[in-house]
């Protein structure tokens, strides 16, 4: 497919990579944005990749209270400098993420935090399902990969669709902020509380 300047601009906005790098990535991936982003990451061309080695020790802790005080969230969002931490873009992003956590109830920040035993348990379930559905064994790995990606979207904050703009994920939201600020930005941790959730009826 033809690669348009609008596509290149959109990829550049999402990743912070150079225009020529974005065009190369889109050409290589035949216009597939997710594959183009992966291409840039593998090449170390995205702003997120370049900034990831920088220490992010400044930042803010944002809070959000929802549903008449029945759900509360705190999110720690980190960056490299106090200057960026005080910007409205940074503070608003932290607040938006806290609001998202309240609504979407993720379990982990990203897939790296999922315990290995939990992943193996999920994979075993998917294998059993594939066997029960009499799927050819040669496509099991592909089926498991697809189901794992769906699982990540359910339990991992960074893989979820952003509630205020479902065209992007939380990961893309962070990458956009990295591109805009020129600093490494990471979601360090979050906590979500729901009134009475630990009480037995």
Curated annotation (Swiss-Prot):
It is found in: Cytoplasm. InterPro entries: EF-Ts_dimer_sf, Transl_elong_EFTs/EF1B, Transl_elong_EFTs/EF1B_dimer, Transl_elong_Ts_CS, UBA-like_sf. Residues 81-84 are annotated as: Involved in Mg(2+) ion dislocation from EF-Tu. Its main location: cytoplasm. PROSITE patterns: EF_TS_1, EF_TS_2. One of its GO terms (cellular component) is cytoplasm. Keywords: Cytoplasm, Elongation factor, Protein biosynthesis. The keyword Mitochondrion does not apply. Belongs to the EF-Ts family. This is Elongation factor Ts. It comes from Syntrophus aciditrophicus (strain SB). The gene is tsf.
């Amino acid at each position: 497919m033809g690669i348009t300047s609008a596509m290149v601009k959109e990829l550049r906005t999402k990743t912070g990579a150079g225009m020529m790098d974005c065009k190369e990535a889109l050409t290589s991936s035949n216009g597939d944005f997710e594959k183009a982003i992966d291409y840039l990451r593998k090449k170390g061309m995205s702003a997120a990749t370049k900034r990831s080695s920088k220490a992010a020790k400044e930042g803010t802790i944002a809070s959000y209270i929802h549903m008449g005080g029945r759900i509360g969230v705190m999110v720690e969002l980190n960056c490299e400098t106090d200057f960026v931490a005080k910007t409205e873009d940074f503070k608003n992003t932290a607040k938006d993420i806290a609001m998202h956590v309240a609504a979407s109830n993720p379990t982990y920040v990203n897939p790296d935090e999922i315990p290995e035993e939990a992943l193996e348990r999920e994979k075993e379930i998917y294998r059993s399902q594939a066997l029960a559905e009499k799927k050819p064994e040669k496509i099991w790995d592909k089926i498991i990969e697809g189901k794992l990606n769906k699982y990540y979207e359910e339990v991992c904050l960074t893989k979820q669709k952003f509630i205020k703009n479902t065209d992007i994920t939380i990961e893309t939201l962070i990458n956009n902020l990295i591109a805009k600020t020129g600093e490494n930005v990471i979601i360090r941790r979050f906590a979500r509380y729901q009134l009475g959730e630990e009480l037995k009826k």
